[in-house]
């Protein structure tokens, strides 16, 4: 029995089929028999319940006191407008909560691109229809709160945070934060040399555009691995006390640039310049970054704002960078 665990086959990522920017099919093999369903179901549940995202949670519409009223000059009922607001795909950079405003008048559709926002917010589906105005003197004025979270939160639980006096005119939404819109997995037979009783795991998923499917599966796998760490040593052996040493660098500098949740364009530009860690990024100056192909002033402003929200800035000097721990990785 000794070495039995080491005898297990280790799967490898054999194919990533990028069907579209939001739709991908990922294949892993070979897996020991039965492990296809074991891992596939676990990853599926984590992807649906534990990947964080952003959503509209509270809405105020001028002249509307509750969701069963009707807005003059607007084709949709208030309930339909709320459902359409739930369909917005939103990313927040450096913030966990923002308030967005939408004002529109005149005949025609009211689209997601009509929402006013700053660089801390990106709306992916700009052509998403929120409602339709039916006459020239029709108008709509919406105030919406967007928050970051994970899982499912009911409107009732949000109402409990307000007293009756401050709840009038606020419309609360049931929220599913997960950016995963569809996830399914299949298990097929795989073969390694003479063994034909192995599994191939195929995961197919679609996101709302706020996260890359490959990044989503990586985050889900990381969450699963972290939750299982406690079972690695069931004896619960007490680790020897180690004197705390002041770290050479702030922990935030050792984190990957992906943790900044930059737009895809900005992130790709940094990766092309081999800027993988936040410590790499903060040592760059504005002039150096502007020399990066395809990285313009808008991306530079985004990077500066995200760093500032973490108490960092460009042009920092870090002695003895990179640390040995990163070089060993």
From Swiss-Prot:
<keyword id="KW-0808">Transferase</keyword>
<comment type="subunit">
    <text>Homodimer. The RNAP catalytic core consists of 2 alpha, 1 beta, 1 beta' and 1 omega subunit. When a sigma factor is associated with the core the holoenzyme is formed, which can initiate transcription.</text>
</comment>
<dbReference type="Pfam" id="PF01000">
    <property type="entry name" value="RNA_pol_A_bac"/>
</dbReference>
<dbReference type="GO" id="GO:0005737">
    <property type="term" value="C:cytoplasm"/>
</dbReference>
<dbReference type="InterPro" id="IPR011260">
    <property type="entry name" value="RNAP_asu_C"/>
</dbReference>
<feature type="region of interest" description="Alpha N-terminal domain (alpha-NTD)">
    <location>
        <begin position="1"/>
        <end position="235"/>
    </location>
</feature>
<dbReference type="GO" id="GO:0006351">
    <property type="term" value="P:DNA-templated transcription"/>
</dbReference>
<dbReference type="GO" id="GO:0003677">
    <property type="term" value="F:DNA binding"/>
</dbReference>
<dbReference type="Pfam" id="PF03118">
    <property type="entry name" value="RNA_pol_A_CTD"/>
</dbReference>
<keyword id="KW-0548">Nucleotidyltransferase</keyword>
<dbReference type="InterPro" id="IPR011262">
    <property type="entry name" value="DNA-dir_RNA_pol_insert"/>
</dbReference>
<keyword id="KW-0804">Transcription</keyword>
<dbReference type="InterPro" id="IPR011263">
    <property type="entry name" value="DNA-dir_RNA_pol_RpoA/D/Rpb3"/>
</dbReference>
<feature type="region of interest" description="Alpha C-terminal domain (alpha-CTD)">
    <location>
        <begin position="249"/>
        <end position="329"/>
    </location>
</feature>
<dbReference type="GO" id="GO:0046983">
    <property type="term" value="F:protein dimerization activity"/>
</dbReference>
<dbReference type="InterPro" id="IPR036603">
    <property type="entry name" value="RBP11-like"/>
</dbReference>
<dbReference type="InterPro" id="IPR011773">
    <property type="entry name" value="DNA-dir_RpoA"/>
</dbReference>
<dbReference type="InterPro" id="IPR036643">
    <property type="entry name" value="RNApol_insert_sf"/>
</dbReference>
<dbReference type="Pfam" id="PF01193">
    <property type="entry name" value="RNA_pol_L"/>
</dbReference>
<dbReference type="GO" id="GO:0003899">
    <property type="term" value="F:DNA-directed RNA polymerase activity"/>
</dbReference>
<comment type="similarity">
    <text>Belongs to the RNA polymerase alpha chain family.</text>
</comment>
<keyword id="KW-0240">DNA-directed RNA polymerase</keyword>
<protein>
    <recommendedName>
        <fullName>DNA-directed RNA polymerase subunit alpha</fullName>
        <ecNumber>2.7.7.6</ecNumber>
    </recommendedName>
</protein>
<dbReference type="GO" id="GO:0000428">
    <property type="term" value="C:DNA-directed RNA polymerase complex"/>
</dbReference>
<comment type="function">
    <text>DNA-dependent RNA polymerase catalyzes the transcription of DNA into RNA using the four ribonucleoside triphosphates as substrates.</text>
</comment>
């Amino acid at each position: 029995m000794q070495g039995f665990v080491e005898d297990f086959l280790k799967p490898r990522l054999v194919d990533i089929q990028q069907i579209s920017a939001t739709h991908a099919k990922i294949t892993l093999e070979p897996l020991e028999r039965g492990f296809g369903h074991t891992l596939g179901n676990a990853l599926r549940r984590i992807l649906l319940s534990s990947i964080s995202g952003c959503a509209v949670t509270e809405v105020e519409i001028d002249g509307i006191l509750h969701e069963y009223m009707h807005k003059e000059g607007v084709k949709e009922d208030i309930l339909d407008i709320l459902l359409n607001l739930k369909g917005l795909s939103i990313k927040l950079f450096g913030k966990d909560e923002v308030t967005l405003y939408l004002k529109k008048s005149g005949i025609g559709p009211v689209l997601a691109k009509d929402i006013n926002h700053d660089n801390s917010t990106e709306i992916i589906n700009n052509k998403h229809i929120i409602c339709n105005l039916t006459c020239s003197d029709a108008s709509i004025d919406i105030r919406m709160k967007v928050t970051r979270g994970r899982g499912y939160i009911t409107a009732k639980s949000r109402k409990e945070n307000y007293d009756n006096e401050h709840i009038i005119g606020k419309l609360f939404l049931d929220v599913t934060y997960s950016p995963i819109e569809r996830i399914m997995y299949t298990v097929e037979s795989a073969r390694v040399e003479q063994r034909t009783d192995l599994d191939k795991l195929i995961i197919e998923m679609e996101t709302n555009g706020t996260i890359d499917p490959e990044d989503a599966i990586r985050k889900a796998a990381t969450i699963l691995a972290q939750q299982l760490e406690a079972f690695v040593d069931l004896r619960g052996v007490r680790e020897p006390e180690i004197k705390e040493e002041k770290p050479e660098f702030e922990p935030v500098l050792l984190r990957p640039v992906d943790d900044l949740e930059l737009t895809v364009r900005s992130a790709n530009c940094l990766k092309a310049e081999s800027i993988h860690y936040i410590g790499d990024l903060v040592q760059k100056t504005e002039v150096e970054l502007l020399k990066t192909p395809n990285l313009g002033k808008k991306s530079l402003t985004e990077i500066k704002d995200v760093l500032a929200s973490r108490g960092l800035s460009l042009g920092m000097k870090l002695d003895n960078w990179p640390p040995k721990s990163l070089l060993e990785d």
